[in-house]
């Protein structure tokens, strides 16, 4: 699902909200989450999951075009850990044949 598809779904289910209002709310939420992660903060949404940063150590990689070894610096990458309710719901749907 893309961001625009999510906006459409919310607008369809919530008749009182305009497409522009939903778009602004989602943009604001994503921007705030990005800013929190950029400063090293952890985001926890109970029942859904948590977002945090994991450190990837420096390593030697390979350029796929040339096959030559390339030194890659260490970096932080966003990580999502699903909450129990989300895991249970996904597995519940899987058991029903979805």
From Swiss-Prot:
Pfam families: Bac_DNA_binding. One of its GO terms (cellular component) is chromosome. One of its GO terms (biological process) is regulation of DNA-templated transcription. GO terms for molecular function: DNA binding; structural constituent of chromatin. Keywords: DNA recombination, DNA-binding, Transcription, Transcription regulation, Translation regulation. InterPro entries: Hist_DNA-bd (IPR000119), Histone-like_DNA-bd_CS (IPR020816), IHF-like_DNA-bd_dom_sf (IPR010992), IHF_beta (IPR005685). Coiled coil: none annotated. The keyword Transcription regulation applies. HAMAP family: IHF_beta. Heterodimer of an alpha and a beta chain. Belongs to the bacterial histone-like protein family. NCBIfam families: hip (TIGR00988), PRK00199.1 (NF001222). This protein is one of the two subunits of integration host factor, a specific DNA-binding protein that functions in genetic recombination as well as in transcriptional and translational control. This is Integration host factor subunit beta.
């Amino acid at each position: 699902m893309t961001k625009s598809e999510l906006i459409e779904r919310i607008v369809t289910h919530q008749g009182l909200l305009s497409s522009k209002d939903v778009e602004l709310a989602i943009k604001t939420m994503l921007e705030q989450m990005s800013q929190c992660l950029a400063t090293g903060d952890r985001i926890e949404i109970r029942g859904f999951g948590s977002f945090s940063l994991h450190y990837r150590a420096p390593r030697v990689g390979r350029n796929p075009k040339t096959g030559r070894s390339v030194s890659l610096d260490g970096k932080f990458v966003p990580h999502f850990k699903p909450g129990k309710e989300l895991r249970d719901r996904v597995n519940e749907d899987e058991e029903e044949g979805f």
